[in-house]
Amino acid sequence: MPFGLKNAGSTYQRVMTRMFESQLGKNIKIYIDDIVVKSKMVLEHLWDLQAIFEILRNYKLHLNASKCSFGVGSGKFLGYMITHRGIEVNPNQIKVINNLRSLRNPKEVQNLTGMAAVLNRFISRSADRCRPFFMLINKWKDFEWTEECATAFQQLKDYLARPPIMSSPEPDEVIFAYITVALYAVNLVLIRVDGGVQQPVYYVSKSCKSLHKAEVRYLPLEKAILAVVLGTRKLSHYFQAHTVVVLTQLSLETILRSADYTRRVAKWGTILGVFDIKYMPRTSIKGQVLANLVAEFTKP
């Protein structure tokens, strides 16, 4: 099938998924024509490669040797760095942002917010961090790179100098969610436990520019529920495959089950009801790593 056709990508993905159905979720990740074979041990890797090659041979598919890498501990996949530690930011993307100086017009600010959007899953509270930039995008006549913008820009660079490493949950593993709300943003982070240490899986953040005007005026409790709803929309594959425990001091479960609250909360309850979501109080923090992560995520 020619890749110029509109449905070529989805058709190719469907065919590849059907071909490698027996290996998906075990030792292989596929996105259209990009394939990653992952193994924990060298000997296992040889067996996994043999199984993949047999499938390719049965379907008479060929690999481009110049684009193949074997026995590597890390590599780029879909714009990210995949290593034994987890999913990391592509250093080239950070380098582009670090090379930027004071921005001179809304177009340059728009380019910056676009580059930051690519890294959203790695940036805690990205909507809060980038709010000064969003406020400048439409100011063509009265554009001014203020001290607030310069400070926010430097803080973004400092954060990206030590970006977090994203972890991938195991099948059927219980994962956790923390939420924070602000006047102009709602935020959520998914976390998994690995060896007693909690590691981030994905950050989600929505700014006032992305929220409807009415949503900006929601009560904090409603914004907290909205953060969970936005999380299910953005990360539906995680919420469908895992039990998600939302850790919060707010009584979200009570409100969602209440028949006396607003119509929109009832609608949200219906949306969230299809997922296996539990709500627990954030009563204790185990380990300094988690303490630092939560402090970074929840600080004003």
Regions found by a protein language model. Name each.
Residues 4, 90, 180:
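Short, conserved phosphate/pyrophosphate- and ester-handling motifs at nucleotide-, phospho-/glycolipid
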Residues 7, 26, 31, 54-57, ...:
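C-terminal reverse transcriptase regions that engage the nucleic-acid substrate
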Residues 9-46, 122, 126, 233-243:
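Active-site palm subdomain of RNA-directed nucleic acid polymerases
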Residues 14-15, 48, 155, 223, ...:
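Well-ordered alpha-helical segments embedded in enzymatic catalytic cores
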Residues 173-181:
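Two-metal-ion RNase H-like nuclease active-site motif
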Residues 181-192:
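Acidic, metal-ligating active-site segments
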Residues 298-300:
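Long, charged amphipathic helices and adjacent flexible linkers at domain junctions
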